[in-house]
Amino acid sequence: MKKLKIIPILFATAFLAGCNNINPSSSSISSPSSNSSSATSGTTASSNATSNSTTDSATSTSSSSSPSSISSSSTSSSTPTIEEGVSKYSHFQSISNKSRQAGFLPSLGNPNILVIPVDFSDYTFVEAGAKSNEAARERIEDAYFGERNDDELHESLRSYYKKSSYGQLDITGVVTPVIRAPRTYAYYKSITNSSTQTDLIDGIIRLALKTLDSTYDYHDFDTNGDNIIDAIWLVYSGPIDNGGNSMFWAFTYWSYMEDKFDGVDVSPYAWAAYKFFDEGGYTDHPDAHTTIHETGHLMGLDDYYDYDGYRTPAGGLDMMDNNIGDHMAFNKYNLGWVKPETITESGTYTLKPLTSSTDCFIIAPKSYNDSEFWEYYIVEYYRPDGLNKLDATTKYSNLKMFTVNGLRVYHVNQKMGYLVYNQRKNSYVWNNSYISDLDSADFESEDKYPYIINSNTSSYSYNTKKDTTLVSLISAAGRTNTQDGKNSDIFTEGTSYDSKNLTWEDGESMNFSFSVTSVTDYSLTFTF
């Protein structure tokens, strides 16, 4: 029996597409095995034409006194040196690549992505509000690769990720001439079957890459040498339609076309409307919230809202939840931008703000395998500044980031286990055991393979304990199953947490507590 590789088919944006409007049946996580591919970025594009056809990881210093006093001392004061046109996967991405057999936009270095504007004979970029195709391309260029000053709040994709990664990720790329889709907007809108939709988008990608073949060498968009285009972005001119099963919203997918272009494959791509740039109503720059969120998916990050619509375990206030703010420490750990210190003893601990430093700590069970793929608490000093400032100041999709300084705490359960083929169900089920040593895990077996077991969407989780989530906000106010994060969820000076009678999933007693003793604009101190 040939092994069925599975990856999430559609990663949707939380804004406008809306988790309550997403049909879970069109977002299944099964897809056939095929060649993999991945996405990247480059420089700028030229003419207008329409086609027919870590920083250093955080370090801790213990004093000789007891209890220990530990300060996380890493900051982003110096920008790492990035080799132009060279990128690489984080550890999380490398393992995920083996698990899903799919490419990702590398999260470290200088990936090069291909941004393709797509219009329709019955809905052009002029009808979408641009003065011309060239004007549309210039606006797309600004949204993706525009330079921003430190005091500007309306980030481009590139400027956001340079700041969020502390200079460890510099996404560059080209915006190509406009490509005319082979069918009308009305035709595509009439298609409601998700498999047909992605086949049609494959057709648009195929047409675009063939049309542009004499203009670009697609090897330039494979910066990590895996023979996969780092990433493709399709920006379509048609209106957003987030109702029912329309394809005209924003999502990320992995193509399985067998075509090669200059010898490289196509794998991750994102699809979103030009109209998303209007959502914030900004006059100085396009709104890039949706672009930034979907690019997180291109790098392998999951959605943290619930597609079933029952809950929002992570509280809604993160770039991978409701498209707002900076990435939380968990995301940065996955993408290789921070290396959290693990708390192993009682003491006093100090953090600098995550917006300006790589400081964060992990609280974990004895079984912790020193990787992203386990169960742990991850703690960070949250401040409503830097990449959090815009969304802490103004609402986006009726939500605002936390507006207070304090300790933000998440519980993570990103363990991997073997999925085993069940012939009766014609699907894969979890064998109820976890893999602690992923470096020696079997990714080649025909009848089982490692996969992340938990999800924030119950129907996507392989864990029969449906209350076990991938990542959840630990509320200082004691709220559970949070829908929208509130300031009271942040641990401010004088607040504390006690794990009481809680246990880790393996049955080990948590048996820890912490108290926030000091919060300034520059640091936060807590006792453990």
Locate the predicted segments by residue.
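A generic structural micro-environment signature
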Residues: 7, 124-126, 307, 326
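Zymogen propeptides/activation segments of proteases
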Residues: 20-23, 76-224, 230, 236-243, ...
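Bacterial N-terminal signal peptides that target proteins for export
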Residues: 1-7
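Ser/Thr/Gly/Pro-rich low-complexity, disordered linker/stalk segments of secreted
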Residues: 22-83
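Extracellular hydrolytic enzyme modules, especially secreted metalloproteases
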Residues: 231-398, 415
